[in-house]
């Protein structure tokens, strides 16, 4: 387990090539359930202009994600995930800050986390 300050992490939008490593991350973080298809969640997110899926990378390796959506008044955070090898470095906190910024840009006054 790593611990210490946040190492160089970059944030960007999801790309098609992220699909397999992202699904692997979500499984490693125990975020998938048999009754909910995560690939369908990705498709719906990408098809909706009021949703976004951000990827965190460290040394060109996917180390985290956050999916968010809003209805104009309320925002939701889903699939907040940090690779177990990248935890305790501030990646999750930085992903939440990115989600909060995304919500502020859309004048969304409330955020709910789907856990």
Place the predicted regions along the sequence by residue.
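Conserved beta-strand-loop-alpha-helix junction that forms the acyl-donor binding cleft
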Residues: 84-87, 113-115
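A short beta-loop-alpha structural element at the N-terminal edge
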Residues: 8-22
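Conserved beta-strand in the GNAT
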Residues: 55, 61-69, 76-81
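Conserved GNAT acetyl-CoA-binding A-motif
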Residues: 103-115
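A short helix-loop-beta-strand connector motif used in the catalytic cores of GNAT acetyltransferases and
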Residues: 43-55, 76
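Conserved acetyl-CoA-binding loop-helix of GNAT-fold acetyltransferases
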Residues: 88-101
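A short, aromatic/hydrophobic, helix- or strand-capping loop or linear motif
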Residues: 33-42
């Amino acid at each position: 387990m790593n611990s210490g300050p946040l190492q160089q992490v970059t944030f960007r939008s999801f790309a098609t090539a992220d699909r397999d490593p992202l699904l692997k991350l979500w499984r490693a973080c125990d975020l998938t359930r048999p009754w909910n298809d995560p690939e369908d969640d990705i498709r719906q997110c990408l098809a909706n202009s009021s949703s976004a899926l951000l990827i965190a990378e460290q040394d060109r390796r996917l180390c985290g994600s956050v999916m968010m959506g809003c209805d104009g008044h309320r925002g939701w955070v889903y699939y907040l995930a940090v690779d177990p090898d990248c935890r305790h470095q501030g990646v999750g906190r930085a992903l939440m800050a990115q989600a909060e910024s995304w919500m502020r840009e859309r004048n969304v006054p409330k955020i709910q986390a789907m856990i």
